[in-house]
Amino acid sequence: MVYADYHVHSDYSDDSWYLMEDVVKDAIQLGLKEICFTDHVDYGVKPDWKPREEFQVGKNKEVKNVHYDLYFAELDKLAKKYEKEINIKKGLEFGMQVHTIPKFEELYQSQDFDFILLSVHQIEDKEFWTGEFQKGHTHKESYDRYYDEMYQLVTTYKNYSVLAHMDLVRRYLDKEVDRFEYNKDKIKEILKVVIENNKGIEVNTSSSRYEINGLTPSIEILKLYHELGGKIITIGSD
């Protein structure tokens, strides 16, 4: 068995202080044989770094996308430095919305990626974690809008590897009770498209860190994925 983590964030993500080389060293210490860096890009709510703006590793915490030049340069350097101890893959987490698809496709074509996570973090440029997306809507309405957006994404965009933390929005709605039945039919349609396109889904272990009652995605989603013939699953600590 090969122990791997395919959802890893470093200091290049605005919500992490974890230096990239420290991630690698800790992964080796834990016995992992493969990791994939998947730092955040969220077009629509975050700008890119401009050429004259200075990014300082370990210091900058501006709400922006990955500093691509520095990120890919350090990733390549560490992959060579530690190649005898661990396999380091090049990826990103695309926090995608339907209206940002063209920007992400441009980014995808700019690099030779090993792995891309497709995530839904915002809808109509409204964040989940701030509560802006949910404001003025019932839980049912929020779930409906979330899975509708996800369905549009997976039926439109194909240059990704795995659909990340599929029921992420639950983290911001109800950690105790899983509302799988609200959107079972829509989830089924999403999974069918994922499978037909030879993509996968992720088991995201951050559910324990966020004290969610159950797995992410839920055991019901995982069972349905298996029943539909899904075979590709990655594990990520996020």
Identify what each model region corresponds to.
Residues 1-98, 107, 172-174, 179-181, ...:
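An N-terminally biased module of ancient metal coordination in phosphate/nucleic-acid-related enzymes
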Residues 16-19, 100-103, 214-218:
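Residues at alpha-helix caps and immediate loop-helix transition turns in enzyme cores, especially N-
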Residues 40, 166, 230-238:
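Short acidic/histidine-rich active-site segments
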Residues 103-104, 224:
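A short acidic, amphipathic alpha-helical/loop segment
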